[in-house]
Amino acid sequence: MHYPFLPHGTRRFSMGFVLVSLMLGIMLPLAACGGGPAANTDTASSGPANLTYWGWIPGTDKMVALFNKTHPGIHVTWVQTPGGQPTYDKMFTAIKANNEPDLGQIEYQLLPNFESTGALVDLAQYGAGDLKSQFVPWTWNQVVLGNAIYAIPGDTGPLGMYYRSDLFKKYNIAVPTTWAQYADAAVKLHAADPNSYISDFAPKSGGWFTGLAWQNGSHFFGIDGQSWKVNVSNPQSQQVATFWQGLLDKKLVKTETDFTTGFYHDLGTGAIATWIGAPWTASSISTNVPSGKGLWSAAPIPQWEAGQTKDGNWGGSTEVVFKSSKHPKEAAEFAKWLYTNDDAIGIYITEAGAYPAKTAALDSKVLNSPNPYYNNQNLNDVFKPASTQVDATFQWGPTMNQFYLDLGDNFSNATNGKGTLTDALSATQTSTTTFMKKQGYSVSN
């Protein structure tokens, strides 16, 4: 099953690939690719079904080795890819050549891009539907389309607030539970120490802002009959943008690129006192800011109204099977096993710092132990409830590569004094609508 409103002639041609290719100045044919033979030519009589899996998560080699040991009829070879966009570029190129691997790791936001190529196997025919009850409910909505199941959820990124508990205690600042309190804390902190800012608004971090908007009930994309709806500048996302614009105008937040040396330096010195992040953010801080041991804690994400328990998501990936596989049944078996087997998930958590989508895994011992870096706090006390509070109706668009690029450029303009963050949302809505229409998508607004 495919989106009924896909651009003509693109069943095997991703819009994400179109974008990347245009950026490189390469002209590519828009006709659908043919269904030639796949590279994998194993047959049942030649021994185990040999599968190739592309992904980037550390520890996957150990998970694959465990699967191969316990499934003698199937042999999986893991090809480690760079992660993120470089992996997707490689996959889109392989799709065009009808030479995909059997399996691939894909983040949630890219699933519509890949599904639009027609290259993904509907896993419902291989019993994937039987797994639905095992996963955090909102993740299942991310991988299904009608009766079709195009991926198996792997991990998630519900949001919480990491904060310098030493600074909050030093300056007698209460841990904020609402965004209004967060803004007040920003004022108090900066007044107490002009070199300390409540947080960092990283303009190029589109996934981070999307998670914040998601928490507030924002829906950038939707489906209206046979067409897409684009509503980036909706009231909920405008409220989030206006809030952060207020902090920017008062010079209470920084605007540096996250995940950089300078960013981690500021986390270490206290120049940045909070970071709205996901479970995986914990290891990013502890690994890159070793001097911060005992200085950081975690709390639930602030709410827009007191007493609410709403959350958004930042990060997480899935497992898909590509149609060029000569062994889709065996590939589906591996995909289902990878994110439901307790031993595999244990490796996933300890080796990659992943936060599993499987509900039962959230009760595992490794996730419910005191963390020495965070004052021996059990971080799962924050993130387990958060994982159930993510809005399950959130919908990704079919051109998320373009969307994030434009959003980042427009936010960068705003943080450099060229307009506001709400202006950036409006500009991104216009450019996204225009881009989708040029690619042949039906857009109703």
Label every PLM stretch briefly.
Residues A186-H190, S227-T257, I301:
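Glycine-centered hinge/linker elements that transmit conformational signals in sensory
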Residues H2-R12, G25, L30-N113, T117-A119, ...:
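Conserved N-terminal structural module of periplasmic/extracytoplasmic solute-binding proteins
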Residues P58, I106-L110, T260, G277-A282, ...:
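Beta->alpha turn/N-cap motifs
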Residues Y108-L159, L212, L295-A299, Y373-Y374, ...:
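Hinge/lid segment of periplasmic solute-binding proteins
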Residues M91, Y182, L189, A213, ...:
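Hydrophobic residues within well-ordered alpha-helices
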Residues I95-I106, A119-V121, N195-S196, T269-A278:
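Alpha-to-beta junction loops
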Residues W280-K293, W304-D406, V443-N445:
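C-terminal lobe and pocket-closing loops
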Residues T93, P101-D102, D130-L167, Y197, ...:
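A structural signal for short loop-to-beta-strand junctions that line the ligand-binding cleft
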